[in-house]
Amino acid sequence: ESPETTFIEEGIKIGKDTLISGFVKIYGNSQIGEDCIIEGNTKIIDSTIEDSVRVDNAVIEKSYMEKDSDIGPFARLRPNSRIGKKVHIGNFVEVKNSSLGEGTKAGHLAYIGDSDLGKDINIGCGVVFVNYDGKYKHRSIIEDKAFIGSNANIVAPVKVKKEGFVAAGSTITQDVNSGELIIERAEQKHIKGYVERKKQRDKNHKE
């Protein structure tokens, strides 16, 4: 679609029945498989996209997407990322130097850096893989069917073992065992009468 607004560098291989919309840019040693949909303001650099992949408004650099996976909108694959079959990378997700196994999903607002994720894992909204200690990068491992709840921090190097369950809001600094639920957050407190006391304090406050 719209070849006048699309840039595909010479030598790029594109499979049959693949749709490339306007404003897409494909550079370098890239290959696009069959039956793909590449749309939005997507940029693909030195990357391989297998068959039946959907890319919507994403930046993909020196990475590999396997069959039936999808990414976007507004997502980014930084170098050395490998996205497995049927993996979903949603809006505002960034992946760097990491692998995601078949069926794993990261739907919203996550950073996955220097990590190896297995199959059928759920990465919740706002999850951050904390990979840098100020001097060195460290890797984390998340095994098959683990669940990482929203706003969790995975502080590398740690391992979440098979079917490990990390509760929302937790900061993980130690390994999580298989089938284990980890909750690491302050206990919720109920302070009765606070609002009325605050109103009175505000009323008596003098500028």
Model-derived regions: residue spans:
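Glycine-rich hexapeptide-repeat left-handed beta-helix
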Residues: 55-207
